[in-house]
A protein has these predicted regions:
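Sec-dependent signal peptide recognition
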Residues: 2-7
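Acidic/polar active-site rim loop that often engages polyanionic ligands
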Residues: 10
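N-terminal signal peptide c-region/cleavage motif recognized by signal peptidases
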Residues: 13-16
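N-terminal export/ancillary region detector
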Residues: 20-196
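Charged, low-complexity intrinsically disordered boundary/linker segments
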Residues: 199-200
Length: 200
């Protein structure tokens, strides 16, 4: 009987170890200020159009090794709500910037690669890759999206944040352990609004 209990304990410990993601390195945290923007306010530009694009390098971020079989999760957190009724690039959701009429999308860190950028969607999904070495892409793209026909040019923004994590929610319960990369704030400064669709 003791031997059976011992074997069961070993099996349980072994399955837990297999389900637990492993990490090396540290989380990277950045903030960005989008300044001297030229934003067109031409009402003929359709809602859902890209008004501005900015690509930033993430630098090295935390390495991981997880397992799809063990249902390890990829978590994207975006601090602001979805703009209701508006879709942007790739038919994806657009998130509030705090400026009425302008939303944003951000690229998916683990699904994007050179020549193929994927717009991110907040939420939990199965890990798209099992280890960093399968796609260690080190750029994030931010798109500003038109969400209303009339943009409130007096708005200043709410400094939204975005984070990317991977892990097993049972065996890697600490959010800090799972966190790979955080864009801690997207700020806006000196926006130049122009009633034209040129010089975006």
């Amino acid at each position: 009987m003791k031997r059976i209990v011992f074997l069961m304990t070993l099996l349980m410990l072994g399955s837990e170890a297999a389900a637990k993601c492993s990490y090396s390195g540290t989380t990277t945290t950045q903030s960005i200020t989008l300044s001297n923007l030229k934003i067109p306010t031409d009402p003929s530009i359709p809602v859902g159009s890209v008004l501005y694009t900015r690509k930033i390098g993430t630098g090295p971020y935390k390495n991981f090794e997880c397992s799809k079989i063990m249902n390890d999760q990829y978590i994207i957190d975006i601090s602001t709500p979805v703009v209701a009724g508006v879709t942007g690039l790739q038919g994806g959701p657009v998130y509030e910037t705090g400026i009425d009429g302008i939303g944003f999308q951000v690229s998916d860190l683990l699904r994007s690669r050179n020549g193929h950028i994927v717009a991110a969607e907040a939420g939990n999904t199965l890990v798209p890759i099992e280890k960093t070495s399968q796609n260690y892409y080190q750029d994030v793209t931010i798109w500003l999206i038109k969400t209303k026909n009339v943009i409130d040019t007096s708005g200043t923004g709410s400094n939204p944040s975005v984070s990317y994590s991977v892990g097993n929610l049972t065996t890697n319960p600490k959010k800090g352990d799972r966190l790979l990369y955080t864009l801690s704030s997207i700020k806006f400064k000196d926006i130049n609004y122009r009633n034209t669709s040129c010089n975006i």
